[in-house]
């Protein structure tokens, strides 16, 4: 979950972060991983990351006779990976299409050759709209007065739940009569919809309770021609993308800002996306792209870069990415209407 910290005091602030790699939400290994949306951060865990990079280079080393065939791809990769933030692994052209911004704004989002690391000094202080102290006190008093009633209601609900559980058999009602089929391709039940870009529907343990026993969920995505599913990542699940119809391009960036996958995909192909890797999909110009994503968590949670930037205070974005006020407004509001994007319709509205 993205967050930022600002020291508004007169003394240096020392913060200690505890990373629980054994948490059930972590479906990777015990290596601590931290990724940044902006800036050019320094490596925080060099020992473990150097070991991983060594294995990666050894695994992807090519014979001399094949080396020239990957020359152009390596140059493009070096051009993309100019910074260490996750957005540095995405081309500025694609970011401009996704966020409906000018090319210069998209380049700044990638933080190329930014000499600043994790900590950025804010000149003149950070001005953010906050609730007044009096309002906070009133809210606290109101919440305290309601707490007693809420406790009584919770006790009554617990008693009723206990009585109902005593009457249930459990086995027949959870297994034998469980709903085991769901049409996630049904357009009428779409969770997200853009008439120009496409639609998305998710099946998890909330909509299909039997998935709780399998610890799986699924996401159906249909992108119309040139439609984009903007950059996003799974907070608590690995995922397997399977193309059903059409063709398009999939871009994947790891936590170090490296573009680990940027290729075209077509019907019948599989792509594995590890937990917390940023991924974006775009349909081709000739036909759309239809695929399903299987996730290793029955309630997989997704974060979208667009929504994160829109919820971040303007002053924070301006200082983190070195943007002007006009660029911040453009980034937060212009065309930022959801994770499904159509570049042509965005530019027309702009």
From Swiss-Prot:
SUPFAM superfamilies: RmlC-like cupins (SSF51182). It comes from the Eukaryota. Residues 104-118, 141-150, 160-170 have a biased composition (Basic and acidic residues). It holds the Pfam family Cupin_1. Keywords: Disulfide bond, Seed storage protein, Storage protein. The keyword Lipid biosynthesis does not apply. InterPro entries: 11S_seedstore_CS, 11S_seedstore_pln, Cupin_1, RmlC-like_jellyroll, RmlC_Cupin_sf, Seed_Storage-Functional. GO terms for molecular function: nutrient reservoir activity. Residues 37-86, 102-170 are annotated as: Disordered. Residues 182-329 form the Cupin type-1 domain. PROSITE patterns: 11S_SEED_STORAGE. Hexamer; each subunit is composed of an acidic and a basic chain derived from a single precursor and linked by a disulfide bond. This protein found in the seeds of many leguminous and non-leguminous plants is the source of sulfur-containing amino acids in seed meals. Belongs to the 11S seed storage protein (globulins) family. This is Legumin K.
